[in-house]
Amino acid sequence: MSTVEPNVYDPHQVETSAQQFWDATRAFQVDENSEKPKFYCLSMLPYPSGALHMGHVRNYTISDVVSRYKRMTGHNVLQPMGWDAFGLPAENAAIKNKTAPAKWTYANIAHMRAQLKSLGYAIDWSREFATCTPDYYVHEQRMFTRLMRKGLAYRRNAVVNWDPIDQTVLANEQVIDGRGWRSGAVVEKREIPQWFLRITDYAQELLDGLDQLDGWPDSVKTMQRNWIGRSEGLEIQFDVRDTNGAALDPLRVFTTRPDTLMGVTFVSIAAEHPLALHAAKSNPELAALLETLKHGGVSEAELETQEKRGMAIGLTAVHPISGEQVPVWVANFVLMGYGTGAVMAVPGHDQRDFEFANKYGLPIVQVVKLREPRNDDEQRWDATEWRDWYTDKSRELELINSAEFDGLDFGGAFEALAERFERKGQGQRRVNYRLRDWGVSRQRYWGCPIPVIYCPKCGAVPVPEDQLPVVLPENVEFAGTGSPIKTEPTWRQTTCPDCGGPAERETDTFDTFMESSWYVARYTSPNAREMVDRRANYWMPADLYVGGIEHAILHLMYFRFYHKLMRDARLVDSDEPVTNLLTQGMVIADTFYRDADNGGKDWINPADVEIQRDERGRVTGAVLIADGQPVHIGGTEKMSKSKNNGVDPQSMVAKYGADTVRLFSMFAAPPEQSLEWNEAGVDGMARFMRRLWAQVHKHVGEGAAVALDVAALSAEQKAIRRKTHETIGKVSDDYGRRHSFNTAIAAVMELSNALAKFDDASDQGRAVRQEALEAMVLLLNPITPHASHALWQVLGRGETLLENVAFPQADVSALVRDALTLAVQINGKLRGTIDVAADAAREQIEALAQAEPNAAKFLDGLSVRKIIIVPGKIVNIVAG
């Protein structure tokens, strides 16, 4: 036990003592040999950027609070930690600092590990790993070669978003206003060979599995459903003719609105479609347009808002029913990566087609009307003015201008057309998914090498398992242009495992989402020879996963998919990796930047900026401390490494102590809401910690408490004890069911305030106070474990791991009141209150209510007709 002056809270001494005890006893190291129910709780693993920010602290404190609470409620709890260590930021730092990415990464891991340990998290550090080590990534290389052999990993050319500065492929979500999200460079479209995983083979299972994830937020499940994007429709064939009438390869289009087929007036294809590329060979104007469209937006938001552009390519498509020839156009809102890269254009009933047709003077035909228009506006159809009902499939519709299909509704038209096309071999029913196969190739150096060898004779050959891992060379010269392993002949050149001839290694590396898609399972058996061993089935699925909702689509989708791959490889038994998901809100803070030479922004940490504020605390100006020159104000944004606006938790821990920082991060907002960093709020939490420390020491300094004798308690003593057990019940519910940590803290603060007003130095008064203080220490232990560890000893309970002490249980008998205060109403209006014994008879309550002085005045001259008693709350006298 540390020696601390009474009433003086020294967080650093307290925290050092507690952490030394936990380390010496290996307090949080767990195994599978326990009769306790298991609870696997973790947060999304951090990228070792160099320093934690308060968003990390909030994330990891949430999982730590739950983990410690579960330990105290009798669970065998696993809370691990590791490092998502590959990725582009390490390369950028290597360029900036003239150091190898590996050296930079490992140094950051050491620093951030120390930061995490200073915060006192109950982590099993024996399971720690970094995803950039061969011991880790060998397993995903082995899995990839097995997926290749099963046909679930394949290589094909794909049109990608190419960042010419970072020299890599970007996901659609990483392209912002046509520029790379990190470099700010104008993004190009290129067709290059890429490796893919067939996530689309699992699309329906991924969709169906969402119905089983009752512990996931509905918002996340909705985003995943929309991303998977299941739609039922028809795939229809359009024959194609050139300018001479000669037949070319037909186009196949997928549509969910076959009822509008007779409204097709042209067919749109993507700029990368083979027909467009073929036509451009003899059409310089078209070729120039296709080159321009390479720089167009690719995200759905950009496709919706960007100006519609296109050109007829000189070919026609034959309408499969009318036989009419309609022109084929290139359109910038059609993407080769979605569907077949061709769509039937129905400008009368699709808004993008409508805008395109009006711009280029193409025909617009109405083929659907509302059966029951609600107003005059819905009775009119105007080819120059778009109305939402034109495409509203949820309304009762009827086909017009559609030959023999006139009068049919959507369902009738769908069935009639499906039967016709299937009979004639012109189409078929099809379920389509918006989800695309996962492109896992990245043209970067700092990533897991893709285990493939290219042989002129044998083609793409998976590296044999006995030659794995393919180790990424770490001591490289890194100039920042492309990947150094592409120009490293001793690494790149090898022999073919099949024929023994000269061959070359794949120089692309895996998308870093690969590493984060299976790490949760690896924690269960970090030293297993295979990817995981039997221990995985003890711990998996994880019981609680904590992370930001920004990961709802990419990480959490790949995470679920990869777990199913592992299940099908008989590595795990469970269908899903996690049963409960908590998506914490952002921690936000001010941002500042200067314009970069490349058109992007150089973000500056707020600690390096002198800020001017108005009387309301709003930022009005800022200068860089180093040179005194102005910087731009970027507004309040999520704390992140990309915006460089993180607060270093180490400085906060140094100033206030870890428990105070943890307490503020849990108190300032509910977990799901954004938390605005406010140091004044941290000061408030520090004052509470000092007050709690003083309360305990004052009580103990007055002598030992006697045993509690419930039967001997006074009314005031019973009231304090009742408050204690009400608090226990509320905090238990807030921790265990609601994850409402801010209200749990508020409840303990209320108990502390009540105890401060309880001035009873009698033996039983001190016994009640002892019980309340012990309860407060245990209730706060999941959030302020260091102080709780020390105060438990001060209260005379000895040095022990509080996680092995049972969480307090509310004594139901203590919640029973001896006396109750009831509201007295006359005809539903409040007229007074009465105090009655908890076991008072009905007749006594009625008499007291009628005798209440103010109520008696309102009853004067009236006859009491009925008295309604709501037990413990209200007496309502009905009189007239």
UniProtKB/Swiss-Prot annotation:
Domain of life: Bacteria
A Pfam entry, by short name: Anticodon_1
Family recorded in the similarity comment: Belongs to the class-I aminoacyl-tRNA synthetase family.
EC number: 6.1.1.4
GO biological process, one term: leucyl-tRNA aminoacylation
CDD domains in alphabetical order: Anticodon_Ia_Leu_BEm, LeuRS_core
Motif 'HIGH' region: positions: 46-56
SUPFAM superfamilies: Anticodon-binding domain of a subclass of class I aminoacyl-tRNA synthetases, Nucleotidylyl transferase, ValRS/IleRS/LeuRS editing domain
Residue positions of motif 'KMSKS' region: 638-642
Enzyme class at the top of the EC tree: ligase
Annotated HAMAP family: Leu_tRNA_synth_B
One annotated GO molecular function: ATP binding
Reaction(s) the record says it catalyses: tRNA(Leu) + L-leucine + ATP = L-leucyl-tRNA(Leu) + AMP + diphosphate
Any one cellular-component term (Gene Ontology): cytosol
Organism expressing this protein natively: Xanthomonas oryzae pv. oryzae (strain PXO99A)
Protein name: Leucine--tRNA ligase
